[in-house]
């Protein structure tokens, strides 16, 4: 690999290994990818594919290369490069947030025939005693956002409790 390829591999695809206090090598990144899919498919061509990827003769889904392991096992959305949604229901907003937090791009439409399906926005909003507790996870953020949008559409402004969030600058889990 040339310097540019090494930089991209290390900065975009290599996972940090806590025990070793370093990022994966290119070979370790490819091994993580191949091992992940080998456990999913019994006839997966592990050795042949590993050799092809390591030598840059074969390129897998780079999103899957980036997320193979716990993240991709937890949610297959992390393996997609892009997605699409019509903004025609309030649920679309938290779905977009969740998909983006999984690292997948989201295209969307706000064409008139779609957005007219959204509820009317109230003319006035009123503060309430309702508190939304934001949990420190992708689903926690998306759920909280869904609650917020729902309350705003009903004319209510809730309080937000962000005390469960990790400190600014802390590593993502």
Spell out what each predicted region is.
Residues 1-173:
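Extended catalytic cores of very large enzyme megasubunits
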């Amino acid at each position: 690999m040339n310097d540019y390829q090494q930089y991209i591999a290390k900065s975009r695809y290599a996972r940090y290994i806590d025990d070793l206090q370093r990022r994966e090598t290119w070979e370790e990144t490819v091994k993580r990818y191949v091992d992940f899919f080998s456990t999913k498919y019994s006839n997966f061509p592990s050795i042949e594919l590993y050799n092809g990827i390591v030598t840059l003769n074969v390129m897998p889904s780079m999103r899957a290369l980036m997320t193979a392991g716990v993240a991709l096992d937890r949610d297959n959305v992390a393996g997609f490069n892009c997605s699409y949604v019509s903004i025609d229901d309030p649920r679309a907003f938290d779905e977009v947030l969740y998909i983006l937090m999984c690292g997948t791009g989201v295209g969307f439409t706000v064409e008139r025939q779609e957005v007219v399906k959204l509820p009317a926005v109230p003319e006035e909003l009123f503060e309430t005693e309702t508190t939304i507790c934001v949990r420190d996870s992708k689903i926690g953020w998306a759920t909280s956002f869904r609650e917020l949008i729902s309350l705003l559409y009903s004319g209510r402004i809730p309080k937000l409790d962000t005390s469960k969030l990790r400190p600014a600058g802390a590593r993502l889990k």
